[in-house]
C-alpha cells in the first residue's frame, strides 16, 4: 500500500496547510486527527478548513458527529484506520493530520482498549457528581499516581475512565497504553513546530481571528443543536470559554483571553507528549520548502 504520512504537532503550527500541499503533490487524501473537527458546525473555533480551502482534496473524519454525540478514541481509531486502508487500496496516499494526542497514538500504534463496564462507570460518575472532580482526582492519585499525574484535575471524564480501567483490570491505567514501536502501515511521521515566542503570537492572532469571524455566534447557534448536552463538544477550547462567559452574563467577548491562555496551555501539553516520540522528524514551521522536506522524510522511511 502507499505509505501514509502523518503531520502532527501543536495547535497553530500550520499542519493543515502543509498536509494539503503534500496531498496535492502525491495524490493524497486527508484523514483528520483533530477530535473537535469531527463535529458538524464546530468550524470557526476549530479552524476547520472550508470546503473551498480543501481544493477538491477528499477529507475524512471531518463533520462525522453531531455535538450531542461523544467523541471517543476507540470510535475514531476504528473509523480512521478503515479510511486509511480504503484510501491506500484505491492507489492514493493517506495523509493524517492533527494534534489530538491520543487519537494519533491510537491510530499509529494500534492501541488496544480495555473493556468497559457500564455499572462500574456509572458508579464513578455518581461519585464524581457527589464529591466533585478535584476530590475524585485525589482518589485516583491514591490508587494510580501515574495516571493522576497525566490527567488534568479538571478532566472528570478521563478520571472516571482511569478509575474504571484500574478497577476492571487490576492494573495501572498506563498499562493499557501501547508501546512505541514501528508505526502502523510504516507511516512517516512529521512534527511541525515554531519558536515559542513566534507561536504565541500566531496563537494570539488565531484567537483574535476566531472571535472576529463569529465564534460567539457559532456557539449560540450550536446551543440550539444541543451543545450543552455534548459530553465532549461542550468542553472544546473556545467553546467552553464562550459558554462560561455567556453563563456569567457576558456577551461572549470576555472569552477571548481565557481561550488564548487555554490554547497556550494545551500547546505545552502537546509539545510534551509529541516530543517523547522518537519516531517524529521535526520541521521548523518557519522554514521555506516545507513540502519538499516532507517529501524527503516520506520517501526515506523504509
Curated annotation (Swiss-Prot):
Cofactor dependence: Mg(2+)
The record ties this protein, via SUPFAM superfamilies, to:
P-loop containing nucleoside triphosphate hydrolases
Q: What class of enzyme is it?
A: transferase
Record-annotated site: Interaction with substrate tRNA: 100, 121
Q: Which GO terms describe its biological process?
A: tRNA modification
Chemical reaction(s) catalysed: adenosine(37) in tRNA + dimethylallyl diphosphate = N(6)-dimethylallyladenosine(37) in tRNA + diphosphate
Q: Which residues bind substrate?
A: 11-16
UniProt keyword list: ATP-binding, Magnesium, Nucleotide-binding, Transferase, tRNA processing
The record's GO molecular-function terms, alphabetically, read: ATP binding; tRNA dimethylallyltransferase activity
Which Pfam families does the record match to this protein? IPPT (PF01715)
Q: Which domain of life is it from?
A: Bacteria
Which EC numbers characterise this protein's activity in its record? 2.5.1.75
Q: Where does ATP bind?
A: 9-16
Assembly, per entry: Monomer.
Tell me its family.
Belongs to the IPP transferase family.
Q: What does this protein do?
A: Catalyzes the transfer of a dimethylallyl group onto the adenine at position 37 in tRNAs that read codons beginning with uridine, leading to the formation of N6-(dimethylallyl)adenosine (i(6)A).
* Name recorded for this polypeptide: tRNA dimethylallyltransferase
Q: Which organism is it from?
A: Mycolicibacterium smegmatis (strain ATCC 700084 / mc(2)155) (Mycobacterium smegmatis)
Gene name of this polypeptide: miaA
Amino acid at each position: 500500500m502507499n505509505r501514509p504520512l502523518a503531520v502532527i504537532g501543536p495547535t497553530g503550527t500550520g499542519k493543515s496547510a502543509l498536509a494539503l500541499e503534500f496531498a496535492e503533490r502525491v495524490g493524497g487524501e486527508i484523514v483528520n486527527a483533530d477530535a473537535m473537527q469531527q463535529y458538524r458546525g464546530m468550524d470557526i473555533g476549530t479552524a476547520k478548513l472550508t470546503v473551498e480551502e480543501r481544493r477538491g482534496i477528499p477529507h475524512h473524519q471531518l463533520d462525522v458527529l453531531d455535538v450531542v454525540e461523544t467523541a471517543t478514541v476507540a470510535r475514531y481509531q476504528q473509523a480512521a484506520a478503515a479510511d486509511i486502508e480504503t484510501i491506500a487500496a484505491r492507489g492514493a496516499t493517506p495523509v493524517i493530520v492533527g494534534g489530538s494526542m491520543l487519537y494519533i497514538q491510537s491510530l499509529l500504534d494500534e492501541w488496544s482498549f480495555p473493556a468497559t463496564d457500564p455499572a462500574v462507570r456509572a458508579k464513578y460518575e455518581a461519585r464524581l457528581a457527589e464529591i466533585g472532580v478535584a476530590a475524585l482526582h485525589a482518589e485516583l492519585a491514591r490508587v494510580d499516581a501515574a495516571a493522576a499525574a497525566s490527567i488534568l484535575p479538571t478532566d472528570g471524564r478521563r478520571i472516571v475512565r482511569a478509575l474504571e480501567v484500574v478497577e476492571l483490570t487490576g492494573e495501572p491505567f498506563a498499562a493499557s497504553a501501547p508501546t512505541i514501536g514501528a508505526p502502523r502501515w510504516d507511516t512517516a511521521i512529521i512534527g511541525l513546530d515554531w519558536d515559542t515566542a513566534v507561536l504565541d503570537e500566531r496563537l494570539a492572532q488565531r484567537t483574535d481571528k476566531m472571535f472576529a469571524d463569529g465564534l460567539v455566534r457559532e456557539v449560540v447557534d450550536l446551543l440550539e443543536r444541543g451543545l450543552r448536552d455534548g459530553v465532549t463538544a461542550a468542553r472544546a477550547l473556545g467553546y467552553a470559554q464562550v459558554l462560561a462567559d455567556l453563563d456569567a452574563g457576558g456577551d461572549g467577548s470576555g472569552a477571548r483571553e481565557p481561550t488564548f491562555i487555554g490554547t497556550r496551555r494545551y500547546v505545552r501539553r502537546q509539545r510534551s507528549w509529541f516530543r517523547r516520540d522518537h519516531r517524529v522528524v521535526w520541521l521548523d514551521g518557519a522554514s521555506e520548502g516545507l513540502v519538499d522536506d516532507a517529501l524527503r522524510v516520506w520517501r526515506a522511511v523504509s
